[in-house]
C-alpha cells in the first residue's frame, strides 16, 4: 500500500452519504458500441446479425436484371487491415480507414419458354473491392484527412403513429380538429385529419386530401397481401361501417311499434324514451327521459328482459347497417348507410321483412363522423378507390387498373419502398395492443384500420385515449453513428444498384464477372461526403478532455431529417419530465440552438431501438434492493419512483412514513410499500460537465448552464492542479476521455522515460510457452490539438511499481494524478479594490504570472507546399534572392528552420522560390542580370513566414516528399530518428521476452548435473561432465548454448522448446516493426501537383494577460483588468497576499451561491494541509498525525467511505506518514458530489480541524492598514478560458483588398481592416471631423487613385490629400446599368484629364474595371 500512496494515488475525502450502487457506464460507449454494431468486424460472417452493414447489403441484394434472367447475390464481406495507423494518418493528413472486400455471386438462369420454370445455367463467385470505410479510433473519433472528427448522435422523431389536434387554431369556432399521422423510417407518410364538419380526410405524402374512406376501400383491392394480413377486409361500405360501429337489431312489431335487442354495453348513458317496467312486477325501473344508470341496467338484466321498446321517431333517424334485400325479387329496399324513414319501414312491413340492423350512433359518445365521410365519398368499389388515389399522386397520368394497384401496393406494402423499422413496428404494436412480429416492417391493413379507429375514439372523447406528446422521450429516439452511416451506405448502394441493373441488361451476361458489374465509386463518394460535409460530422472540440467527452455524448435535434433552428418552437426546446436521468436539463448552448442541442446524462445509455434508458434500483415491499435495471421513458411511465436521497436504513427499508416520489412527471408523497423503483444516484439526472460543478444544488440554473459550458473552454495549463474541492467524478472523466494512458494488463513497470513506459505484463503461461508479455506505451509529446492547444503526456509511475489493469500510468493534458485538472486552486478575496473589479473584472496577483500558474502552451502548425507550376517547379531551398544572411541564420541547408529556433512575426520558417514569368526587362534589370547571373531574375521569394501575432519556439518539422523525388538532408535525418526510435522499441521488447524465456530455462537447469561435456564453436570446453549447475556457473555459459546443455530427464527438450518458442516470438516482433519501418521509408502520398510538403510546428507560451477571460465553475466569468505587484495586494494576518480579488456584487443578483460554499470549503481544506505541515515541522510524532488525518479524512460520522479511508490511513507505515502529509501541503482534497454534497455542519467541522474562519481580517498592501470589514477569503478553482487576448488582438496598415469593391478585407484571418459602419460615420459627423471622415471614406477605403497619390505625396514630402473616385461608386453604376438604367458619370475636362493620367500610371483599364485590383489573399503594398 505504501508505494501506491506516495505515487499515483490520490486520497479524497468524500462527503457523499449515498452508497454507490452502480458504476457510471463508460462515457464514450454510445459512440463505440454503435459503430461496432454497424461494422460487426470481429463477428464471423455467418454469425452476423442483419443490422448495420450486413443489414444494408442484405436489403439491397440480390439485384436482378429487368428480365430476371440473372441476379447478383451478396455472400459476405470482410474488412482488411488499415494501411496507416492512427498516428501516421494524423501526420500525413490521411483518412484512417480500412478496405472493405465483398464476396458476391452472379447467377445466370435459363427460363423454359413453355412452363416458365427457371434452372441455373451458371454461377460465378468473386471477391470485389468495395472502397474504404473509415474506422473509429479507440477514443470514439474518426480521422478524416488528418483531423479528428466526431459524429454527433441525432435526436429525431421516432417512426410510428402520432395523434394530435390543432389546439383550435384552424377554424374560427375554436373547435379541436384531431389528426393522425403514420411516419415510417423511410417511405410515404399518411395523414388523417378531421375538418370542421367532422368529415375525415386522408393525405398521402402531403398531397391533396381525399375522404378517408377512399383509402379504406382501396385496402380491399390490394392483391393478396392478406396472407400476411391479420384481418379479412374487402373494403365494402358495410365492412367499413361494421368495423367502426356497433349495430343494433330493430324488430317491427306492428305499425309504429318497434323493439330492439337489449345490449347492456350500449345502454349506458342513453335516455329512456318511455317508462321501462319490469315485465313481471310492473314496477318502473327507468323513468321516462332519465338515463340508464349502471344499477338500472343490472336490474334489467336481472329481470331477464331480452328487448326494449323503441319510439318510432327514434327509429326514423337511424342509419341502416347493411343492404336489406327483398329475397323474392332481389330488389334492394334499404341501402347500407341510408337513413331509415317512415316510408322505408312501411315498405319493409309490406314485404314482410320484420327486422333490420342499424348502426349504433348516439351523438353523445359515438358520433356519425365516419358515416358522414362515407356519404361524401362518391366511390363505390375498391378498384375505383385505387384509381382515385393514383390520380391524386400522379396527376396527369392516365391510370390503368394494373399501374394503379402496383403504385398503391408499392406505397405501403413493399419492403423496398416502405420501411417502418423495428422501432416503428414496436411503437404501433404498443399503441394499439397488437402482436405483429417485429420483422414485419411494412404496414398491414389492420395498422391503417386501427389508426382510424384510435382517431375516431379520440374525436368521440373516449376515456384513456389521449393525443401524443411529441416531446416525450418515448416519441423521440437517438440515431447514433452506426445508424447514420447505415443510412448513408444504403443511399450509396441504391445508387449503385441502378447502374448494375443497366449494365446487366446492356452487356452479354455470360462473359461478365461480378467485378465488371460493380463500380464502388457511388458508395465511397456518399461515405466521403457524409464524413466531410454532413451537419452531424463535426470537427472535434479538443480544447480539453472534458470538451472531447461532452462532444461525443452530445445529442442534436438538428441535421438532415431533423429540425431547423428557425422552425423549432418553444416546446421542443423545453425540458420535459421524461428527460429525468436521460438528458441533462442544464447543459445546452445559449443562443439560437438552446434546447436543440443537449447532452446525455451521466448514467444514461441508448438501447437497441435508439431510446434513451436510465437505471433504477428495484424496490420490493418497501425495501430497496441492489438490483439495477434500465428503463426507457415508455417503460418507466406507470411506475412510482423514489429519489436517490430518500432516507433508507442499513437493510434498505425506507425510514420515513411517506416517501417523496415521481409518477408520470408529477411529484407525490406515497407509502413505502407503494414505491416500485428508486434512483441509482443523485447525479444521474445531470450530464458529465454539470456533475463536475461542486454545490451545483446551490446555483441558479442559468448560471449552472454557463458553468457547465465554460468548463469545456478551459485551456490546459502548463502546471496542472486537480481541484481541492471536486465532486468525485474527475477521475472517471480523465480515464474515459482517452487522454491519459491506462494500463492494458496487470504487470510491473520495467522502464520509464518522458516519452515511453515499458511494462512487463503478468501472462500465465505453461512451462515451455513464451508469450509476448511486453506492453510498450509510447506517450504523446507536444502534439497540436484541433484547437491549437497542446497535447502532452507525462508518466506518473516509477520503475519496479506494480500496476493493475485500468490504472492510469501517464497523465495527459489537463489531468493530474489521473484526475481532471482544468484550472488552478487560488486564494480569492471577495472585495472591491479601487474599482478594478467593476462589472465582473478580475484583479490578479503578479505571482500567478511569475510562477507560471496560468501559463498555457499553444501549438501552431504552418504548412509550406512546393508545387509543379506552369512556369516550372517551385523549390524549397536556403538560396533565396534579396534576403540577407541574418534572416537565414536559423535555416539548415535544406531551407527548413532548425528545431529550437525562437521565431517572431516575419521570420522565415521555410525558404521557397517560385519561377517568375518572363517579362520585358528594364535596362537596370538587364545590368543586374549581366553582373549577378541568371538566378536573381527569374524567381521570386515565396517563403513561408511567421504571421503577425505569433512568436514562439519551433518544436518540430516534418518533411513529406513525393515518391521518386530525392529526399533532402532534413528528411533523411527525421527518417533516421524515427527509425532509431522504432528499433529501440523492438530491441527492448525482444530483450524482455528473452530475459523471461531464459529465466524459465534457468529455473529448469539449476541444481541439475551435467551428463555430457559442452564445447563452444571453437572447441573450447564450457562445461565438463558431472558439473552441478548453479547461478554462477550458468552465467559463464553464453545463452545461445543453454539449449545444448545435456542433463538427466527431459529438461533439455523443454529448454530447446522454450528457445524455439522464443525465436518464433522474436520473428513476430521483428515482422511487426519491419512493416512500420518499411512504411517510413517509402514516399508519401501527396495531393496532385505537389512535389514536397513541409510542416513546421511552433509552440507559443501564453501567460495570463490583461484582457484574458477567466471563470470559476459556477458561471462566474470575468475579464482580467489589472495585474498588481504582490506587495500591493491585500494580505492575510500571516502575511500571505491573496491571488485574485473578485467583486462581491457578482454573487447576489446571479444567485450562484455555490461559489461561496466552494470558497469556504476550499479554505478549510487548504488550512488542514497547513496545520498538518506545521505538525510535521514541530515533530509531533506519528500518533497525533494519524489522529488528525483520520479526523480530517474520515470525519466524525464515518460511513462506509470514511471507514475505508480511516483503514487506509491506519495502514500507512510510520516513515511514510511525512511523505503523505507532504502531498497535502497545498491542501487536502475533498469531493462533494452533486445533490449529495457537504452539509453546513460538516463544513464547519472541517473548518475547525484547520482552525480556519469564514471571514478574515485583510490588510491593505499599500498602506498596511486593516480594511474596515472582514472579508470572505478562501480557495476557489479558477479556469483560464480559450478566449485569449493575444489571439484576438489585431492591427493592419496595408494589406489585401477585395477584388470587386477594392475595400480592405475584414477579420483577423484575412489580415483585414476595421469596419466603419454608418453609426461610426454619425459619430465622426457629430464631432465635425470632416477631414478624418473624408480620409476614412476614400483613400483608407476604396479610392485606388487616391491611395497612389497619397503614397506619392508622402514620398515627396508634401502633405496634401487629393481624393479620387471611390471604386464602390463604379460598382454602384454597374449595378444600375445591369438593371437597364442608363447612368453615366459626367466629368469636367480637368477631372477627366486627371483621371486618365492616373489610369495610365496605374496601367488600369477604362472606368469601372477593377484597377490595380489584388485578388483577396494576396497582399498589395500601395
UniProtKB/Swiss-Prot annotation:
GO CC annotations on file: DNA-directed RNA polymerase complex
Record EC number: 2.7.7.6
Key words, A-Z: DNA-directed RNA polymerase, Nucleotidyltransferase, Transcription, Transferase
GO biological process assignments: DNA-templated transcription
Segments of this protein annotated with the region Disordered: 1392-1422
Signal peptide: none
Pfam families in the cross-refs: RNA_pol_Rpb2_1, RNA_pol_Rpb2_2, RNA_pol_Rpb2_3, RNA_pol_Rpb2_45, RNA_pol_Rpb2_6, RNA_pol_Rpb2_7
Enzyme class: transferase
One example GO MF annotation: ribonucleoside binding
Catalytic activity entry: RNA(n) + a ribonucleoside 5'-triphosphate = RNA(n+1) + diphosphate
Record's subunit section: The RNAP catalytic core consists of 2 alpha, 1 beta, 1 beta' and 1 omega subunit. When a sigma factor is associated with the core the holoenzyme is formed, which can initiate transcription.
The protein's role, per its UniProt record: DNA-dependent RNA polymerase catalyzes the transcription of DNA into RNA using the four ribonucleoside triphosphates as substrates.
PANTHER family for the chain: DNA-DIRECTED RNA POLYMERASE I SUBUNIT 2
Protein family per UniProt: Belongs to the RNA polymerase beta chain family.
Protein name according to UniProt: DNA-directed RNA polymerase subunit beta
Organism this protein belongs to: Anaeromyxobacter sp. (strain K)
Lineage: Bacteria, Pseudomonadati, Myxococcota, Myxococcia, Myxococcales
